[in-house]
Design a protein with these regions (language model features):
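Extracellular glycan-recognition regions
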Residues: 24-245
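Hydrophobic helical h-region of N-terminal Sec-dependent signal peptides
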Residues: 11-15
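C-terminal motif of bacterial Sec signal peptides marking the signal peptidase cleavage site
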Residues: 17-19
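Bacterial N-terminal signal peptides that target proteins for export
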Residues: 1-8
């Protein structure tokens, strides 16, 4: 009797494992590598291939244009200095296994008006591992052009002040394996480095795209256009040689 019970339980476990494994394989079979598709198609990104990690209060997609209307008290930040853990900003992303590529997008934040209103590029893996780059409104005199990298649940923030009358910004997000570079541009042609970083959790399949949020009592509409993918524009280092192991 006991042997029969044991065999029955073992059979049930094997069936459950098989079902889970089938489901996992099915998910992999349905995976659409947006970067690979874009590279094969001349660099154009079909926005209908991107997905919401979290939806905003309102949004609109028209051709290659996306608008996001933020809700108040939405943000991305983990622990450092402020001690709070904010993890509710709307994020619109694509997935890829590609190890070398660049992603470019133009942002328009002419409607931002309250402190920390922001929009930009993002690579959001989970609550504790992500990066973002954006312009954050401060006041009528200046804004913060900056980037945040979050590893293992702790965020940092690197910024520089820019005039408040800047209302558009291009970003270029580049990947070389698990190293990343973020650049910005006022004209979409001449890019300046903002950040080089390493994210251990981002060595395999990643999700990346755009985001917008309003951490304080505010709401605004951000516009994203000119989405494109290309071969990696962040070239391999050709200066000082690595130290010998």
């Amino acid at each position: 009797m006991e042997l029969n019970k044991t065999l029955s339980l073992l059979g049930a476990c094997l069936m459950a494992f098989s079902a889970c494994n089938t489901s996992h394989n099915s998910s992999d079979d349905n995976f659409n590598d947006t970067v690979a598709s874009a590279l094969a198609g001349g660099g154009n990104i079909a926005l209908d291939q991107m997905q919401w990690t979290r939806e905003p209060m309102a949004y609109s997609i028209s051709g290659d244009s996306l608008s996001i209307t933020t809700a108040a008290h939405t943000d991305l930040w983990q622990r450092t200095y402020y001690h709070f853990r904010n993890d509710n900003a709307p994020v619109f992303q694509m997935q890829t296994d590609e190890q070398y590529f660049s992603f470019v997008v133009k942002t328009d934040f002419s409607q931002s008006h309250r402190r920390f209103d922001q929009c930009g590029v993002v690579m959001y893996l989970d609550s504790d591992n992500w990066l973002k780059a954006s312009v954050e409104y401060e006041n009528e005199e200046f804004q913060h052009l900056g980037s945040v990298v979050t590893n293992n649940g702790y965020s940092d923030w690197a910024t520089t002040a820019i005039p408040a009358d800047v209302k558009t910004m291009w970003y270029r997000f580049s990947r070389r394996a698990d190293d990343y570079c973020i650049e910005c541009s006022r004209d979409g042609s001449n890019f300046s480095q903002m950040r080089i970083c390493h994210i251990p959790a981002a060595a395999g399949r990643i999700s990346f795209g755009v985001y917008a949020c309003s951490p304080e009592e505010s709401s605004f509409t951000a516009l994203f256009t000119d989405f494109s993918i290309s071969e990696c524009m962040w070239k391999a280092h050709d200066g000082q040689q690595p130290d010998e192991e």
